[in-house]
Every structure is written in structure tokens, then in C-alpha cells.
């Protein structure tokens, strides 16, 4: 009995014709982020001109942990420079902030800009890595494909990793203060998402360090502030995009601060989402930092 090969050959030819298109789609990944006019994104993987990725030995585990540094060309020898410590969101990198518009504004304003990894890029800077959402709050969606783990891997205990995450930030701060002539009255802290929650924690725990703190789309689930909270002594900026599912919890946090008459600014950026707020809010962040110098005695 003779079998026709025409259908199978047609199927094979069709598959071969489709393969390039399938490969192209697979390589495209997520669509590019769309920023407002005048905002530049940049890479979270490859450092741009003027940005260094450095490493140091983290004593508790002996691992080499990364941090990123940008130094404005406006800084002169012997001149005290303002410093910004930047904390990435969940699965981000040390370049989450140290790129694009943030670098442009740091250059223009004469800042040193430093991105810490927080032991690794899934740890919470002293806060549990995956906070439990408050009632009625929707956390941002998890990425479909988890980005690679960056940073320390030797420690596996969640509580220890959380403590190491905080310790890494403070280690990096200490290293930078020793290397550069830092203006102690102009040390600022900024964080996004998980890093925003971490920035709130570090501001609360070390209030005498920071001249101001900026929380961009921060993970603030179940956070309560009282009149005795140390963070009430620090000028604070809250920024969120109107397309971000976290906007409700951040509004609630701002309302807590209003009730306590805490000095802070709350900005909702039109058209921005959980990711684009990072670069999209930087002009407001730098204007906010420029207005705040830590008092001699707080």
C-alpha cells in the first residue's frame, strides 16, 4: 500500500518556516519599559560609563559581594561630597539605581551614588524577604522567569540571610565613608519595592545617619508607625505610579504619617507602574534630597 508523504512534508516545511519567528519571540523577552520624556533607563546588567562594580570580602561567609559606585566629576579633592545609598527591589542588581537618569542627576548634582546588593538580590535588607500582604492589598506580580541569583549563596537560613542583607548595606556604607570625603550631614537613602521596605527599616534603625529617605513603590505591608518611631524624625519622600497595584498600601502609609504630622512628601506619578517609577521619579528624588541637610543635632 502506497502512503502519500505530501501532508507530512508540508507540516515539516511549515515548522521550518516558523522556527525563526519563534526564536525571535523567545529572545525578545518582556517589552521595553516606557518612560516619560527626558527620562533615561539604562542597563541593570552592564555598567555604563563612569560606573564601577566593585567587590569586597563579606567576613561572615568569606564571599565576594558586589556593590556599584558612581562618582560625579564635579567632586574635587578635599571637597566633602553628598552620598546616596540605593537599595534594589526583589531580584534587582546593584545597578537598579546606578544607571540612566539617576546617574545623570548624580553627575549634575555632584553626588556619589552607591548601589548595594544586600547580601543577595532576593534578601530584604533586614526585613523578611517575602512580606505578607495586608488585607485587601495586591502585591506586584512575581516575574514569570526568575532572574539569576546575584550575590551571596553560602548562607541558606532565611533569618540569617535577612540579617546579612542589612549588614552588607552597612558594610558598604562604612567602606565608602572611609574611601571618600563624605559630607556626614548629606547622606541619603533610596529604595525601590523590597528595597523601599528595607530603606524604611534602615531609616528606623539608624535614624542619625540619614539626611533624608526616598521610598519608591515601597513594600510596606502591615507597617505601623507611631509617634515614637524613629523614622518620624527623618524627612521622607514616598513616590508611586498610578498604574502600580501597591498604591493602596502606600496611600495608607502616607495617611499614617499625616496623622502623626510627620514631615513627608507623597507623589503619585501619572502613567508609571511598579518598574518605571524607579527612573521616572528620580527628578523628584534629587530635588527632595537637595532641600534637606541633616541638622547638627537631631
Give the residues covered by each predicted segment:
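Primarily recognizes the serine-hydrolase "nucleophile elbow" in alpha/beta-hydrolase
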Residues: 97, 174-179, 185-232
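Serine-hydrolase catalytic machinery in alpha/beta-hydrolase-like enzymes
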Residues: 53, 57-68, 78-181
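A domain-start/cap signature at the N-terminus of enzymes
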Residues: 24-81, 142-146, 165, 194, ...
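The feature captures the conserved acid-bearing segment of alpha/beta-hydrolase catalytic domains
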Residues: 212-287
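Cell-envelope and extracellular/periplasmic
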Residues: 88-90, 177-180, 192, 199, ...
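Bacterial N-terminal signal peptides
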Residues: 11-21
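Alpha/beta-hydrolase fold active-site loops
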Residues: 82, 111, 211, 234-235
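Bacterial N-terminal signal peptides that target proteins for export
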Residues: 2-12
